[in-house]
From Swiss-Prot:
Any one GO BP annotation for this protein: galactose metabolic process
Record-level GO cellular component terms: cytoplasm
Family matches, as PANTHER family: GLYCOGENIN SUBFAMILY MEMBER
Assigned keywords, A-Z: Carbohydrate metabolism, Cytoplasm, Galactose metabolism, Glycosyltransferase, Manganese, Metal-binding, Transferase
Organism lineage string: Eukaryota, Viridiplantae, Streptophyta, Embryophyta, Tracheophyta
Location in the cell: Cytoplasm
Metal-binding found in the keyword field: yes
Name this protein carries in UniProt: Galactinol synthase 5
Molecular-function GO terms, alphabetical: inositol 3-alpha-galactosyltransferase activity; metal ion binding
Reaction catalyzed: myo-inositol + UDP-alpha-D-galactose = alpha-D-galactosyl-(1->3)-1D-myo-inositol + UDP + H(+)
Length: 333
């Protein structure tokens, strides 16, 4: 009996770090308080004892003081230039989505053999380093949920169909044709950087008409043939809590994506719909506990490790004076 990708990830993968360059990567733009998210993510990865660094793909409009905060938190700053798609005449779900096309630059980071991309509004509550050992040649991500009003322009939403629970509403083949391909949320991706892929992404994006969900739609189209779904535990989209609670066990969740309106911890708004739920407030509280934990600040963490594990501390110290303080040249391909 063939084991599914999901079961293979959870059951059979072993971690081997020797001679392999791996890293987490996130994306940062603008001069607002989004740096707080990256700090929270960096501290979350430390809390779960991840063995790998956090690279921050940073646009030129990120202030120097914000960059220094991230360096002080052990992040590796990687400067990138924006990627602009063709003009969108229909509009995006959110106006700021247009800048997210710049995330395509992470495929250029070929100094890493495998990377895990995480949006800034994500927190890691369990170690997911084992995902680096997924088979090469594929893009791994979690299936999205179509039940929120942000999907109102899609045929899935209009007929009440969601790929998270396809048994609830059968796709009407007679009237709408074949079911749509499985569609992933691009807030969390496991991928292998590759220059050929990178250059092709930049070429294809310039001849592809932008759509409602911007780079997420584009990535779904581009990687359709090599996409492999992984369990929702690796990217819990908030809407799953009230749309598909039968699929969710919070004790098993590794990664939480604070993407629902009002749910972002640094500007939590209990007045927004669903934000008065106790499970939401608990997850927001957990984010703040990590963010405010000074023992997870990079310097304090290294000092603690030096007492517990001198070898680990030596490696971390070398990183501090070597990799972390080095901001690589910007990409402008």
């Amino acid at each position: 009996m063939t084991m599914t990708v999901e079961k293979r990830i959870e059951a059979d993968v072993t971690v081997s770090h020797e001679g392999v360059e791996r890293a987490y990567v996130t994306f940062l733009a603008g001069n607002k308080d989004y740096w707080m998210l990256v700090v929270g993510l960096a501290k979350g990865l430390r809390k779960v004892k991840s063995a790998y660094p956090l690279v921050v793909a940073t646009l030129p409009d990120v202030p120097e003081e914000h960059r220094q905060i991230l360096v002080d938190q052990g992040c590796i700053i990687r400067d990138i230039e924006p990627v602009y798609p063709p003009e969108n005449t229909t509009g995006y779900s959110m106006a700021y989505y247009v800048i997210n096309y710049s995330k395509l630059r992470i495929w250029e980071f070929v100094e890493y053999e495998k990377m895990i991309y995480l949006d800034g509004d994500i927190q890691v509550f369990k170690n997911i380093d084992h995902l680096f050992d997924t088979p090469r040649g594929y893009l791994y991500a979690v299936k999205d949920c179509f039940c929120e009003v942000s999907w109102s322009k899609t045929p899935q939403y209009k007929i009440g169909y969601c790929q998270q629970s396809p048994e609830k509403v059968t796709w009407p083949v007679e009237s709408l044709g074949a079911p749509p391909p499985v569609y992933f949320n691009a807030g969390m991706l496991v991928f292998g950087p590759n220059l050929v892929t990178y250059e092709d992404l930049l070429r294809v994006v310039q001849i592809t008409t932008p759509t409602y969900f911007a780079e997420q739609d584009f990535l779904n189209i581009y990687f359709r043939d090599i996409y492999k779904p992984i369990p929702s535990t690796y990217n819990l989209v908030m809407a799953m809590l009230w749309r598909h609670p039968e699929h969710i066990d919070l004790d098993q969740i590794s990664v939480v994506h604070y993407c629902a309106n009002g749910s972002k911890p640094w500007k939590f708004d209990e007045a927004e719909e669903h934000m008065d739920r106790e499970d939401i407030k608990m997850l927001v509280k957990k984010w703040w506990e990590i963010y405010e934990d000074s023992s997870l600040d990079y310097k304090n963490f290294v000092e603690t490790e030096s007492k517990l594990n001198p070898v680990t501390a030596t490696l971390a110290s070398k990183k501090l004076v070597g990799d972390v303080l080095t901001s690589l040249a910007p990409s402008a391909a």
